[in-house]
Amino acid sequence: MVENQKAMPQPEMRRIRRIHFVGIGGVGMCGIAEVLLNLGYQVSGSDLKESPVTDRLKSFGAQIFIGHRAENAAEADVLVVSSAVNTSNPEVATALERRIPVVPRAEMLAELMRYRHGIAVAGTHGKTTTTSLIASVFAAGGLDPTFVIGGRLNAAGTNAQLGTSRYLIAEADESDASFLHLQPLVAVVTNIDADHMATYDGDFNKLKKTFVEFLHNLPFYGLAVVCLDDPVVREILPQVKRPTVTYGFSEDADVRAINVRQEGMQTYFTVLRPDREPLDVSVNMPGNHNVLNSLATICIATDEGVSDEAIVEGLSRFAGVGRRFQVYGQLPVEGGDVMLVDDYGHHPTEVAAVIKAVRGGWPERRLVMVYQPHRYSRTRDLYDDFVNVLADANVLLLMEVYPAGEEPIPGADSRKLCNSIRQRGQLDPIYIERGVDLAPIVKPLLRAGDILLCQGAGDIGGLAPKLLASPLFAAAQGKSK
């Protein structure tokens, strides 16, 4: 029965055989494509370049085109596009001309969720980790969920998987307001912060109203799981007319964490729930922000009847998500080693949470930080916040802003950030021009016992493996043996 479920297209889309993804290598697209492949659909897709993601999809049977051309979409029954793709794309133009439906990725995700028990995780920060934790705990409880995540689960080696149960767990993306397509049975809001404000015409009240609208997509018998520690979530809560469970460190939260203790990568805490005995748990991730992500998971797992034993097991064996405080290894330096960490954080709130986690888990160590701002608009809008939070590193190297398709904005660049941080008088940042080899710059700055954090959402994601493979550090490793 399970095999038939995986092999046959779902009845709600029985007229659709071939699905074409424009930008199939994107993190939001590839997971949906993989699930559809496993459901038996013919999947094709185009992207600007080959990548491990496109190679993986090709190995599953997807037809991959490099470059965007009209003929790529000619045989498709439907096109799936991200918000970054517009009607000038030749594949989209062809589809519109031939009256082939063109749908946003979130609408396709909504179709996958339509006849399943959908769990959607929204919020400015923590979506990927929380979604991944829920999938891990559900798997430990024997529920075998389908999941679509915005990052690669280290244990599964993928960001999507077709399960055999009725559960579908997915991220709900507020960046383009596309999460309004989703109609889950359970919805999480981890927090609400000022980001992607162009989508909301620079109006924070509009952003808040959109989150309320998202929660009202729940049926009257659904469940909203929200973080009471977040002041904006607390503010909108009276407007939410759906059953609600709150979580956090706050004393008035329904589900609370107490007795938090961090030892390096390991975080221990006790969970208090209504009408339940206290539950002692641990997660292999540092920081209070990951305690909150775990609490959201515990709320949902408890509501769905997952046993406490499975909750404890699923959290404790969780191996993390790619680029979320991912420890790449140890870099050899004179007198010892440096712990090399890669992280996706690109908003001041995320940067602050990671720095706090480092200080909590390794209080005696220096933090050497290589940071790459993501988008000129974000750098401009949150400039003062970036200055304040980045100044908390012991050593700071600032790469030039990753544009993500944006044109430069005067005064919103890394050189200006360096100057502003320097003027505070507590740190002298080093500006790194685009394309510079960082290994010979970083190595003299490192001391045994340091933590080297590479952080940002742009191409800095390739820096940690490059440093690990650098002949400079390989030579040092040879000397230390």
Curated annotation (Swiss-Prot):
Source domain of life: Bacteria
InterPro entries per the UniProt record, alphabetical: Mur-like_cat_sf, Mur_ligase_C, Mur_ligase_C_dom_sf, Mur_ligase_cen, Mur_ligase_N, MurCDEF_pg_biosynth, UDP-N-AcMur_Ala_ligase_MurC
Signal peptide boundaries: none
GO cellular component: cytoplasm
Keyword Cytoplasm: yes
Gene Ontology molecular function, alphabetical: ATP binding; UDP-N-acetylmuramate-L-alanine ligase activity
One GO BP: cell division
Cellular compartments annotated: Cytoplasm
Keywords: ATP-binding, Cell cycle, Cell division, Cell shape, Cell wall biogenesis/degradation, Cytoplasm, Ligase, Nucleotide-binding, Peptidoglycan synthesis
Binding site for ATP: 123-129
Catalytic activity: UDP-N-acetyl-alpha-D-muramate + L-alanine + ATP = UDP-N-acetyl-alpha-D-muramoyl-L-alanine + ADP + phosphate + H(+)
Enzyme Commission number(s) of this protein: 6.3.2.8
Functional pathway: Cell wall biogenesis; peptidoglycan biosynthesis
Enzyme category, top tier: ligase
Keyword S-adenosyl-L-methionine belongs to the record: no
Family: Belongs to the MurCDEF family.
Stated role: Cell wall formation.
Protein name stated in the entry: UDP-N-acetylmuramate--L-alanine ligase
Organism listed in the record: Pseudomonas fluorescens (strain SBW25)
